[in-house]
Design a protein with these regions (language model features):
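Non-catalytic helical tethers at domain boundaries
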Residues: 1-131
Length: 131
């Protein structure tokens, strides 16, 4: 095996580990948000989710996982809008966000390609927040 090939394998291993951590951070924040929180705690959880989505997007780009990066871009945009006071999280939004996290996990494992229908749904929800 070439050094470049070994490096790429190691890079993907690191990506999977980091991706799992970022997904868990977003899931943890979403669960807390879904249970309800005061305004300060809600802002903290949205910020945490925004940062995790942003970091995961960059990591996905670094390992040429463009479909994961695309979903993360949608998540990041939604969390940015929420962070800036545009709209609130409702059942439909939570469902779509959880589905996106599940899809990212599947794509990390190479089990599934991106879902354009999910991306479209996230974009519609983002548009609704942006008003």
């Amino acid at each position: 095996m070439s050094n470049e090939h070994e490096f790429n394998i190691r890079l993907l291993e690191v990506f999977r580990t980091e991706a799992r951590e970022h997904r868990q951070a977003i899931l943890s924040a979403l669960r807390k948000l879904e249970k309800g929180a005061d305004a300060e705690r809600e802002a903290e959880m949205v910020e945490k989710s925004f940062r995790a989505a942003h970091t995961l997007k960059g990591a996905a780009r670094a390992v040429n996982k463009s479909q994961i990066a695309g979903l993360c871009q949608s998540l990041e945009a939604i969390f940015s809008l929420l962070k800036n006071g545009h709209g609130r999280l409702g059942k439909e939004m939570f469902d779509a966000l959880y589905e996106a996290i599940d899809r990212i996990e599947m794509m990390e494992s190479g089990n599934e390609d991106g879902d354009s229908a999910l991306n479209s749904r996230l974009n519609v929800l983002r548009g609704a927040l942006d008003g």
